[in-house]
């Protein structure tokens, strides 16, 4: 809309009717004009509608139910059935709670508290893999932290808020996305208090770190320097609310079973005395399943920290059969990975005989490294073969026996008369 006054063409907003002198900016279109105030109003209307649609989508989005979560975990993690069930329920409830918060505007509605998770199990039992698989399944930001590198703020070492900084980096400093992520803190047992009694001296890497983690795990607004770096008084910070971040803590807790036994098994003399089991390895998992908060406090975690981790899942020590399953059954099993790698070397087949798989599993048991040690055993067994194969012609198949795993003889090479298949790029 326009009109001439004193030789000057006066322009008006086509929506609100204000003149160009009454507004800051007037934008022209084909025979129409819109002012900055109307643009801002339109943006507000669109923003509200988009937020409403996104909240509805979030509420209706396909959050897998515990049974479905368990089935997906089964594809990657062998055994640990009870731990998978506990994790499936805990993670489902956590993200169901977030979806309820997204669509709820009633201030009087019952507030659902967050339940963080503690995983207890020996090295190589699958604690880290469970957390990684859950994050991948739910498509949320995931970050791992090592508790042994953490210290209190002001001391040499890694500040606990650095964990949130890593989470922000994973999602390109999108605070909203980071606030729905998963943080896995490994080796949490290594920050246990050195004795039952509070120390007179400062314990900056033990009880001090537990105190520093308390608020972060429970829920606080962490101030993180943008794009990393150290904090400076005059710089702007990215504010991240940790209330809805799911924290999963894991640790081996060596010696915890002794504390549980001491509490649960009664000593005595005569006919009424309880007989203590001498086969500690056999019922190791059963003992750990009986863990109580008081046992964790006795181990060295402060009561407030134990209280922030209400969901406790214990993982079994892996036996020979479980290790063989780990080698062969999961979607990304190690044997499948090496078979694919050999097939890339001109279509060569790689076969592991049953005795070879047993030998690999036994080696891992001797090393007490669980599933984590399987790859290094395979690398050692296949090193010479992987070194020689690219220089050999017409190899069709490589067979691995228990003697190859033990280092007695080299793997068996089966040759073909046909020329080698060209390598794929």
Curated annotation (Swiss-Prot):
GO MF assignments: ATP binding; ATP hydrolysis activity; ATP-dependent protein folding chaperone; protein dimerization activity; unfolded protein binding; zinc ion binding
Q: Which gene encodes it?
A: clpX
Keywords associated with the record = ATP-binding, Chaperone, Metal-binding, Nucleotide-binding, Zinc
Which residue intervals define the domain ClpX-type ZB in the entry? 1-54
Q: Which residues form the signal peptide?
A: none
Note the PANTHER family from the entry.
ATP-DEPENDENT CLP PROTEASE ATP-BINDING SUBUNIT CLPX-LIKE, MITOCHONDRIAL, ATP-DEPENDENT CLP PROTEASE ATP-BINDING SUBUNIT CLPX-LIKE, MITOCHONDRIAL-RELATED
Q: Which InterPro entries match?
A: AAA+_ATPase, ATP-dep_Clp_protease_ClpX, ATPase_AAA_core, Clp_ATPase_C, Clp_protease_ATP-bd_su_ClpX, ClpX_bact, P-loop_NTPase, Znf_CppX_C4
Protein name according to UniProt: ATP-dependent Clp protease ATP-binding subunit ClpX
Q: Which HAMAP family match?
A: ClpX
Q: Do you know which Pfam families this protein is assigned to?
A: AAA_2 (PF07724), ClpB_D2-small (PF10431), zf-C4_ClpX (PF06689)
Chain sites annotated for binding Zn(2+) = 13, 16, 35, 38
Chaperone in keyword set = yes
Q: Which Gene3D superfamilies match?
A: 1.10.8.60, ClpX chaperone, C4-type zinc finger domain, P-loop containing nucleotide triphosphate hydrolases
Name the Gene Ontology biological process terms.
cell division; proteolysis involved in protein catabolic process
Role of this protein: ATP-dependent specificity component of the Clp protease. It directs the protease to specific substrates. Can perform chaperone functions in the absence of ClpP.
Regarding protein family, the annotation reads: Belongs to the ClpX chaperone family.
Binding-site residues for ATP, renumbered to this chain: 122-129
* Keyword hit for Zinc: yes
Q: What cellular component GO annotations does this protein have? A: HslUV protease complex
Q: How does it assemble?
A: Component of the ClpX-ClpP complex. Forms a hexameric ring that, in the presence of ATP, binds to fourteen ClpP subunits assembled into a disk-like structure with a central cavity, resembling the structure of eukaryotic proteasomes.
Q: What SUPFAM superfamilies does the annotation carry?
A: Glucocorticoid receptor-like (DNA-binding domain), P-loop containing nucleoside triphosphate hydrolases
């Amino acid at each position: 809309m326009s009109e001439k006054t004193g030789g000057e063409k006066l322009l008006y907003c086509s929506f609100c009717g204000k003149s160009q002198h009454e507004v800051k900016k007037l934008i022209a279109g084909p025979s129409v004009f819109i002012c900055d105030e109307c643009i801002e109003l339109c943006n507000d209307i669109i923003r509200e509608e988009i937020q409403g649609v996104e909240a509805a989508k979030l509420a209706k989005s396909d959050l897998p139910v515990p049974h479905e979560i368990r089935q997906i975990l089964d594809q990657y993690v062998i055994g640990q059935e009870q731990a998978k069930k506990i994790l499936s329920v805990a993670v489902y409830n956590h993200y169901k709670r977030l979806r309820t918060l997204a669509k709820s505007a009633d201030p009087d509605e019952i507030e659902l508290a967050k339940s963080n998770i503690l995983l207890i199990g020996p090295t190589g039992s699958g604690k880290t893999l469970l957390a990684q698989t859950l994050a991948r399944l739910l498509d949320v930001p995931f970050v791992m932290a090592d508790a042994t590198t953490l210290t209190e703020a002001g001391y040499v070492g890694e500040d606990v808020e650095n964990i949130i900084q890593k989470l922000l980096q994973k999602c390109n400093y999108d605070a909203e996305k980071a606030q729905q992520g998963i943080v896995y803190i490994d080796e949490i047992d290594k920050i246990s208090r050195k004795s039952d009694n509070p120390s007179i001296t400062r314990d900056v890497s033990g009880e001090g770190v537990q105190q520093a983690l308390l608020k972060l795990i429970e829920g606080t607004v962490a101030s993180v320097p943008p794009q990393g770096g150290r904090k400076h008084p005059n710089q702007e910070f990215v504010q991240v609310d940790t209330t809805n971040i799911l924290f999963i803590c894991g640790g081996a807790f060596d010696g915890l079973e002794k504390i549980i036994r001491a509490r649960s098994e009664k000593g005595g003399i005569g006919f009424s005395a309880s007989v203590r089991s001498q086969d500690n390895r056999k019922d190791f998992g059963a003992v750990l399943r009986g863990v109580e908060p008081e046992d964790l406090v006795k181990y060295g975690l402060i009561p407030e920290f134990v209280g922030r981790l209400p969901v406790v899942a214990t993982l079994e020590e892996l036996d020979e059969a479980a290790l063989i399953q780990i080698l062969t059954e999961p979607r990304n099993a190690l044997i499948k990975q090496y078979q694919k790698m050999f097939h890339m070397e001109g279509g060569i087949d790689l076969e592991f005989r049953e005795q070879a798989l047993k030998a690999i599993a036994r080696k891992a048991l001797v090393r007490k490294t669980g599933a984590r040690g399987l790859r290094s055993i395979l690398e050692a067994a296949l090193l010479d073969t992987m070194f020689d194969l690219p220089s050999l012609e017409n190899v069709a198949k490589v067979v691995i026996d228990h003697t190859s795993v033990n280092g007695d003889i080299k793997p068996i090479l089966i040759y073909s008369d046909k020329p080698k298949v060209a390598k794929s790029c």
